[in-house]
C-alpha cells in the first residue's frame, strides 16, 4: 500500500502551478458603550492551481499481476480525475470575524467561513482502461456527492466563544474562554506532538493556495483557562465537551491518497467492480479530552 501513496505524492508535489489572491473586504472598529466595541473583519481569497504533468501510467491502469494491484486501484481516483492541464482548484472563499467586547474585560468572538470550488462541480477526467475501478457507485466522470459537498463548497461557523480577562493581583491575571475555540500550547517543526491532539485539522485547506494557519485548525467546544501567576509562571488547563474529527481530503479529490477514506468514500475494491461498501464512521464520546500545563 505504501508504494502507490509515495508515488502519488512525488508526482503531485512537483507538478503544480498555483496562484492566489487575498484581499480584506471590510475591517471596522465600532464603539459599543463606554468601554466596549465591535470589531469585524472580512477577508476574500481566490486561489487557482493547475496540474502540469499527466497521471502516472502505473497508477492509472495497474496490471492485474502487479503485487500492489489492490493497493493501486484503491489509491488512484485522485490521480485519474485530473488530466494534464486540468484545474485542481478554482476556489473563492470568504472568512468573516466579529469580536464584540461588551465591557472592559469580557466579550464574544465569532468566526465563519464559506467557499466554492468550481473544479469539483464539473466532470472528471477519469477514463481508466478498466471500467468500474473508481471507488464510488455513480458515473466515474462525476465526483461523488460527498466529494462535491466537502471539496466543492460549504459554509460553516468555526469559532463561537465567550471570553473574559480578569486582573487577580498586581502581577497575576486570569483568562477564560467558553465555547468553540482553538487551544494550542505549542508546536514543533516536523511533528504535531501535543498540538496535534488538542486541535483537529482540516487537511484539505493545507493544500489550498493562499490558505493561512487559522484556516485549517478546527475549533472544538471546550472550556479553557490561562492563569498568569507572575511574568514568569503561567498555569493552564482545558476540558473539551465536543469531539470533532479531522477533515481528510475528500475521496477522488486531487490530494486524496486513499479512495476509501474521507468524505465521498463509498467502497474498497478487490477487483474492478467488486468490493466492500464503506459503512458509517464509529464516533467516540464527546467527553474525556482534557489537559493541564505550566509554562515558565
Give residue ranges: language-model regions:
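Transmembrane beta-barrel domains of outer membrane proteins
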Residues: 31, 95-101, 163-165, 226-228, ...
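Gram-negative bacterial Sec-dependent N-terminal signal peptides
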Residues: 1-26
Amino acid at each position: 500500500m505504501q508504494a502507490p501513496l509515495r508515488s502519488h505524492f512525488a508526482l503531485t508535489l512537483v507538478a503544480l502551478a498555483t496562484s492566489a489572491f487575498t484581499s480584506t473586504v471590510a475591517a471596522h472598529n465600532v464603539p459599543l458603550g463606554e468601554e466596549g466595541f465591535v470589531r469585524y473583519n472580512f477577508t476574500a481569497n481566490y486561489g487557482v492551481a493547475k496540474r502540469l504533468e499527466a497521471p502516472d501510467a502505473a497508477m492509472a491502469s495497474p496490471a492485474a499481476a502487479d503485487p500492489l494491484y489492490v493497493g493501486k486501484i484503491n489509491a488512484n481516483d485522485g490521480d485519474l480525475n485530473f488530466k494534464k492541464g486540468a484545474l485542481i482548484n478554482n476556489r473563492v472563499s470568504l472568512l468573516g470575524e466579529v469580536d464584540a467586547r461588551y465591557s472592559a474585560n469580557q466579550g464574544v468572538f465569532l468566526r465563519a467561513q464559506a467557499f466554492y470550488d468550481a473544479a469539483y462541480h464539473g466532470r472528471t477526467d477519469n477514463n481508466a482502461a478498466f471500467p468500474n475501478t473508481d471507488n464510488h457507485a455513480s458515473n466515474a466522470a462525476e465526483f461523488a456527492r460527498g466529494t462535491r459537498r466537502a471539496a466543492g463548497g460549504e459554509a460553516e461557523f468555526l469559532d463561537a466563544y465567550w471570553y473574559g480577562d480578569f486582573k487577580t493581583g498586581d502581577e497575576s491575571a486570569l483568562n477564560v474562554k467558553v465555547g468553540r475555540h482553538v487551544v494550542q500550547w505549542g508546536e514543533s517543526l516536523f511533528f504535531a506532538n501535543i498540538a496535534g491532539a488538542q486541535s483537529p485539522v482540516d487537511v484539505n485547506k493545507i493544500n489550498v493556495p493562499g490558505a493561512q494557519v487559522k484556516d485549517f485548525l478546527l475549533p472544538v467546544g471546550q472550556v479553557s483557562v490561562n492563569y498568569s501567576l507572575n511574568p514568569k509562571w503561567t498555569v493552564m488547563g482545558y476540558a473539551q465537551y465536543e469531539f470533532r474529527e479531522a477533515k481528510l481530503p475528500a475521496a477522488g479529490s486531487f490530494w486524496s491518497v486513499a479512495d476509501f477514506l474521507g468524505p465521498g468514500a463509498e467502497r474498497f475494491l478487490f477487483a474492478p467492480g467488486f468490493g466492500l461498501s464503506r459503512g458509517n464512521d464509529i464516533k467516540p464520546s464527546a467527553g474525556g479530552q482534557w489537559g493541564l500545563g505550566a509554562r515558565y
